[in-house]
Amino acid sequence: MRIEKGIGIKNVLKIMCPGTQLREGLENILRAKTGGLLVIGDDEEVMKLVDGGFYINSEYTPSYAYELAKMDGAIVITGDLKKIVCANAQLIPDSSIPTYETGTRHRTAHRVAKQTNNIVIAISQRRNIITMYKGDIKYVLRESSVILGKANQALQTLEKYVAVLERVINNLNLLEFQDLTTLFDVVTAIQRTEMVMRIVEEINMYILELGNEGRLISMQLNELVKHIERDGILLIRDYCKDGLQYNEVYEHIQKLNSSELLELDAVARTLGRGGIPLMDTLISPKGYRMLSKVPRIPSNVIDNLIKEFEELSNIIDADINDLDNVEGIGEARATAIKDGLKRIKEQVSLKKEI
């Protein structure tokens, strides 16, 4: 599984992406060019900063938010976004809290967000920009057309990266069946998989920002990546040094910065195989990835096979009786494994010829 990054901003974007009631209200205020200041949450920490205004305690609707924003003061909405607590309120945060904003509305929003750790939204009257603050986080909401353009560009980049990854994996598949895999081939495949997954993360952020307008992008993304992450994890499991936990290795790879990821030696070190020549070191897979492609073979049976034979080449060379002796494998399953691996080998050879 991927390490969750930017959980705070993701949770905020979910409640204010296109298609939500809150976003509709913000867009109405933006189009009216009245400007606005909204605080999400009516806890004690927020309410003690509120001065004046009038209490409404009415159901939240986008049209109510738009009408109330015509007044200069702030609008306070409950944390569940169901009620407008008060409107035309003056917010008086601690003036000693540092802020780099210039406009009065944005300075107030920034300070309130820092002091209460609540979501505060400032809508600029002149610049037509919606800015969200939460704690130290500042995020400017962009128009859907801008995000769509960036998402489509990222998808085109992803297509090219996936095509390169497929070529690398096809080459690796052939070498695995010939038992001629080098550390260079393995590390290149893992590096390329991680590059693809990082672009996927970026596109997922765009999808989150687009809300209900991101469905087509999401469908295209799912079609492109399919089982890439799963195969990448199995690749790590096949080649990481004995004694290392494959999920921890995967986490270390995710933590590599962009320049480290470009260094194949750095990727090799995460597998516990640093300091050895990449091109000249032959390395045999355990077989998790290839065996996972054989239909109807449970994971515990794959574990038993690898525990017994240790390497994929030994499993390929084993006859049906040898496979039958492994716990959880009868004659029928042994035949299925043998035939399945043979079929995969033929498919791999055909792809190479093409």
Curated annotation (Swiss-Prot):
First-tier enzyme category under EC: transferase
Domain DAC: 6-144
The enzyme's E.C. designation: 2.7.7.85
GO MF term list: adenylate cyclase activity; ATP binding; diadenylate cyclase activity; DNA binding
Keywords, comma-separated and alphabetical: ATP-binding, DNA damage, DNA repair, DNA-binding, Magnesium, Nucleotide-binding, Nucleotidyltransferase, Transferase
Catalytic activity: 2 ATP = 3',3'-c-di-AMP + 2 diphosphate
InterPro entries with a match to the protein in the record: DisA, DisA_sf, DNA_integrity_DisA_N_sf, DNA_integrity_scan_DisA_link, DNA_integrity_scan_DisA_N, DNA_integrity_scanning_protein, RuvA_2-like
PROSITE patterns, per the entry: DAC (PS51794)
Cysteine disulfide links: none
Cofactor(s), by name: Mg(2+)
Cited Pfam families: DAC, DisA-linker
GO biological process terms on file: DNA repair
Its biological purpose: Participates in a DNA-damage check-point that is active prior to asymmetric division when DNA is damaged. DisA forms globular foci that rapidly scan along the chromosomes during sporulation, searching for lesions. When a lesion is present, DisA pauses at the lesion site. This triggers a cellular response that culminates in a temporary block in sporulation initiation.
Family statement drawn from the similarity comment of this UniProt entry: Belongs to the DisA family.
Oligomeric form and interacting partners: Homooctamer.
Protein name per its UniProtKB record: DNA integrity scanning protein DisA
Species per Swiss-Prot/TrEMBL record: Clostridium beijerinckii (strain ATCC 51743 / NCIMB 8052) (Clostridium acetobutylicum)
